[in-house]
């Protein structure tokens, strides 16, 4: 067998061997006793902070997938119009341990990444790897826009932080997660 064909065959075999359980890529052991026992649906007006379904009327944010549900692997939240009543946003910050993805469902925003301001609009996505200085800025008073924010991994403290903001609309220094500078 020629060298190119051998290498191509070997590379093509990796996914098959992985699915067959012959190759294990050191995945984190997952405790399947925790989290929901079946799929869940969270409606537009619902929130799931701490794995508990609620219908908050005056929330700034809605939790859609709780870190409790994913064993701290993932946290997904959506904004509500209330959070974008004023122009501005949180100060630029760094997450040492979490990647953050921002998806613009509707409206226009500015994502600040490593000193650069980037305008984002409906359908745009910003991926911010851990260790990157960033923030999201609302440039419009009473912005009707909506964003989805995804954090991964998502320690419980991350969800608690956003839960506090959802209820209070502000940030308390004593709830900032470890590694958020």
Labelled PLM ranges:
Residues 80-82, 94-111:
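Short, conserved beta-strand element in jelly-roll/cupin
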Residues 115-130:
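Short acidic-glycine-tyrosine-enriched beta hairpin
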Residues 3-26:
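N-terminal export signals
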Residues 139-181:
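Double-stranded beta-helix
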Residues 111-112, 128, 134-141, 147-149:
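Short beta-strand His + acidic residue motifs that chelate non-heme Fe in jelly-roll/DSBH
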């Amino acid at each position: 067998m020629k060298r190119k064909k051998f290498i191509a065959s070997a590379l093509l075999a990796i996914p098959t061997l992985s699915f067959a359980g012959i190759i294990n890529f050191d995945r984190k052991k997952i405790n399947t006793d925790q989290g929901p026992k079946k799929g869940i649906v969270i409606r537009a007006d619902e929130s799931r902070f701490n794995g508990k379904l609620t219908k908050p009327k005056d929330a700034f944010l809605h939790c859609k997938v709780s870190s409790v549900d994913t064993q701290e692997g993932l946290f997904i939240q959506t904004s509500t119009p209330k959070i974008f009543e004023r122009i501005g946003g949180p100060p630029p910050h760094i997450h040492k341990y979490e990647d953050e993805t921002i998806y613009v469902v509707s409206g226009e925003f500015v994502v600040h990444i490593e000193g650069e301001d980037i305008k984002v609009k409906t359908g745009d996505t910003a991926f911010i790897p851990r260790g990157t200085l960033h923030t999201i800025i609302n440039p419009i008073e009473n912005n009707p826009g909506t964003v989805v924010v995804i954090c991964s991994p998502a320690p419980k403290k991350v969800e608690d932080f956003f839960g506090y903001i959802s209820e209070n609309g502000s940030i308390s220094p004593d709830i900032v997660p470890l590694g958020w500078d």
